[in-house]
């Protein structure tokens, strides 16, 4: 496993992470590890939009209506 060290983190940010870790009943290391993994493995907005656009472009039915996909895409784009 890799080790990551973050330097020059503002104290208020570090304190917020410490509080959140405590509230979650986790060590700071465990909490930060979980958040980093979730951040990478979760889909971001651009990835979600790309998936929707691929579904719209495909000839096979994605199982939902084109209107639903387009509405979801508009919502993800903030408009």
From Swiss-Prot:
Keywords from the named record: Toxin-antitoxin system
Species per Swiss-Prot/TrEMBL record: Mycobacterium tuberculosis (strain ATCC 25618 / H37Rv)
GO biological process, one term: regulation of DNA-templated transcription
Function: Antitoxin component of a possible type II toxin-antitoxin (TA) system. The cognate toxin is VapC1.
Record-linked InterPro entries: FitA-like_RHH, Ribbon_hlx_hlx
Source taxonomy: Bacteria, Bacillati, Actinomycetota, Actinomycetes, Mycobacteriales
Official protein name in the record: Putative antitoxin VapB1
